[in-house]
Amino acid sequence: MFDLDAYLARIGICDRPGLASVHRAHVISIPFENLDPRRGIPVSLELADLERKLVYQRRGGYCFEQNLLLKAALEALGHDVELLLARVRLGRPPDSPRPRTHLVLRVRADGAVWHADVGFGRGTLLEPIPFGPGGPHEQSGWRFRVVEDGPELVLQTAQNGEWIELYGFVPEPVPFIDVETSNWFTCTHPRSPFVTGLIVSAVRGDATRVSLSDWEGLALSEDNPAGGTVTPVQPAEVGRLIATRFGLEGFNG
């Protein structure tokens, strides 16, 4: 059985909160990271394993882990949650689509339907947004919108005066077995960026995003809606940065 009290303590909440409060607290409290796939360790999506890793061991995880943990919490709070699989569009030309390897949630709460996602790393939503086309939605200075592109709904974010595509998805729920298959590909395929690269991200209380990644050269980035900085990092610094900037001890990247 899911330990809701332990989860709420992990994200710093002591009462029975609403959807937006849970979502924002989760994003701020639990880092995004791929340290297990990076080290050749497959990712388990069993709820007990998610609780052990993200709640009790105070680790982070990537989209499947993050959003399945959020799903369990929201269901324990009485909300209806459906699973959706998305194709990441960020950094990808339109004629070269990626597989559906990103998990998104559709949540029914407070008499409305919401698009929830705590698992997109440095570009993730801070709070749920109304499900379907619409926006812009401003969240602590970050701006998001959803547009239609054929059968897909596409989440975009504003950067430097332009709308950047993050991911697209067909708004049809999928069974858990599809999520397991997508997760297995993501954490074990030799060409998966989560196997070959490093990404650790966190959102601060002031909505600043901090990321350590080697996807485009090993660097530490700090971003806020007004701009950001990128600082090159030496490999010998990785373990210290993972511990001091993201609260994850005992890892060397």
Predicted regions and their residues:
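Mixed-charge, low-complexity segments
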Residues: 1-60, 65, 75-99, 120-253
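Short beta-strand scaffold segments in enzyme catalytic cores
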Residues: 103-106
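Beta-strand scaffold of nucleotide-dependent catalytic cores
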Residues: 116-118
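Active-site beta-strand-loop-beta-strand hairpin of nuclease catalytic cores
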Residues: 110-114
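Hydrophobic alpha-helical packing residues
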Residues: 70-74
